[in-house]
């Protein structure tokens, strides 16, 4: 083997090793994001053992809620209707007699600009559509869209928007967006997203 061939072979090995290392690092970084992995109706302790985010135990015989000890994303693990949210700072998991009965969260770690807000809600809606969720009450509360009409509605502090989705008769999601006065950025339009997940509480 000539010197040039040896140099080229070694260079190829180095490039391959660096590529593999970078891939591993990216996967590790993504998997290091704390998450709460659950499905409505399951034992609370099963969620605790499965989740990478730390969260306290349920209170036997009580209906209450718990909060993760760090920012965390929700991974809803129903085999058909599953979805994943961005990291959340406000995140509560409701339980009744040690069974999970609902989630209420804001899938963001700070108030967002309108463009970023729409990216989050449209991504969630797209996940739901692909998984077979169906928007309900669309005449009164249509799904969010990136249109001039929707942007004007969200900018109106007296309006905002709400969208409801059903997964057959198993689950319901409510998604709410409204303007938020952010004292850290008083000159910017910022928005809060609220997501509620439980068994259906309204009719289609």
Tell where the protein language model's regions lie, with residue ranges.
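Long, continuous compositionally biased terminal/linker segments
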Residues: 58-61, 66-96, 148-204
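A general, composition-driven signal for non-globular sequence regions
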Residues: 4-5, 22, 144
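Short, Lys/Arg-rich N-terminal segment immediately upstream of the first membrane anchor
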Residues: 1-9
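Amphipathic alpha-helical interaction segments
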Residues: 52, 72-73, 136, 141, ...
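Long, charged/polar, surface-exposed segments that mediate recognition or autoinhibition
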Residues: 89-160
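Generic alpha-helix signal with a bias toward terminal, lower-confidence helices
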Residues: 15, 50-52, 56, 95, ...
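N-terminal leader/targeting segments
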Residues: 10-15, 19-99, 106-107
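Generic detector of well-ordered alpha-helical segments enriched in charged/polar residues
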Residues: 37, 41, 122-125, 174
């Amino acid at each position: 083997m000539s010197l040039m061939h040896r140099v080229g072979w070694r260079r190829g090995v180095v490039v391959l090793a660096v590529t593999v290392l970078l891939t591993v690092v990216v996967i590790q970084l993504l998997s290091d994001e704390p998450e709460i992995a659950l499905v409505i109706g399951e034992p609370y302790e099963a969620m605790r053992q499965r989740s990478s985010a730390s969260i306290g135990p349920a209170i036997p015989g009580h209906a209450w809620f718990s909060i993760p000890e760090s920012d965390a994303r929700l991974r809803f693990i129903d085999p058909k209707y599953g979805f994943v949210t961005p990291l959340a700072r406000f995140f509560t998991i409701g339980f009744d007699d040690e069974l999970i009965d609902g989630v209420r969260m804001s899938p963001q770690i700070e108030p967002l600009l309108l463009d970023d807000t729409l990216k989050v809600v449209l991504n969630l809606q797209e996940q739901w559509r692909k998984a077979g969720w169906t928007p309900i009450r669309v005449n009164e509360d249509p799904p969010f869209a990136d249109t001039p009409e929707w942007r004007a509605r969200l900018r109106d502090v007296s309006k905002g928007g709400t969208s409801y989705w059903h997964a057959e008769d198993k689950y319901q999601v409510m998604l709410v967006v409204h303007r938020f006065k952010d004292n850290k950025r008083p000159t910017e339009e910022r928005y809060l997203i609220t997501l509620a997940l439980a068994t259906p509480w309204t009719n289609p």
